From Swiss-Prot:
Modification after translation, per record: The methythiolated Asp-89 contacts a modifed residue of the 16S rRNA close to the decoding center, and might be important for decoding center assembly.
InterPro entries, A to Z: NA-bd_OB-fold (IPR012340), Ribosomal_uS12 (IPR006032), Ribosomal_uS12_bac (IPR005679)
Modified residues (3-methylthioaspartic acid): 89
Function: With S4 and S5 plays an important role in translational accuracy. Interacts with and stabilizes bases of the 16S rRNA that are involved in tRNA selection in the A site and with the mRNA backbone. Located at the interface of the 30S and 50S subunits, it traverses the body of the 30S subunit contacting proteins on the other side and probably holding the rRNA structure together. The combined cluster of proteins S8, S12 and S17 appears to hold together the shoulder and platform of the 30S subunit.
Species annotation: Thermus thermophilus (strain ATCC 27634 / DSM 579 / HB8)
Comp. bias regions, Basic residues: 109-120
Entry's family note: Belongs to the universal ribosomal protein uS12 family.
GO molecular function per UniProt: rRNA binding; structural constituent of ribosome; tRNA binding
Protein name according to UniProt: Small ribosomal subunit protein uS12
UniProt entry keywords in alphabetical sequence: Methylation, Ribonucleoprotein, Ribosomal protein, RNA-binding, rRNA-binding, tRNA-binding
Gene name of this polypeptide: rpsL
GO cellular component labels: small ribosomal subunit
């Protein structure tokens, strides 16, 4: 334990908070280009084929990003928008691709939680809601 005199001379060192999403460089989103699009298997006890993409970002980093939702149209050279947010059962995946922006199309036939998956409001549902 330091003496009062030592604290006066040196002071306490502040604990720096380490970023969970360093590739974003403090920005909320970052644009990037897909280099590889593939499926990976999750950690135990889960079992699936999770869709991920390796993305080269404008910040210079190359990161692995999760592709949310059912089905996607991404391939090599697709331009995508990345946000922070890890996938708990995929080690090393700390970013999500934003659906409905750039080359990542929204999820088809999605009715609920549409804003999270980049899906526009369905036309026929809007008309029937107006009649009732």
């Amino acid at each position: 334990m330091p003496t009062i005199n030592q604290l006066v001379r040196k002071g306490r060192e502040k604990v720096r908070k380490k970023s969970k999403v360093p590739a974003l460089k403090g920005a909320p989103f970052r644009r990037g280009v897909c280099t590889v699009v593939r499926t990976v298997t999750p950690k135990k006890p889960n079992s699936a084929l999770r869709k991920v993409a390796k993305v080269r970002l404008t910040s210079g980093y190359e990161v692995t990003a999760y592709i949310p939702g059912e089905g996607h149209n991404l391939q090599e050279h697709s331009v995508v928008l990345i946000r922070g947010g890890r996938v708990k059962d995929l080690p090393g995946v700390r970013y999500h691709i934003v659906r409905g922006v750039y080359d990542a199309a929204g999820v088809k036939d999605r009715k609920k939680s549409r804003s999270k998956y980049g899906t526009k409001k369905p036309k026929e549902a809007a008309k029937t809601a107006a009649k009732k």
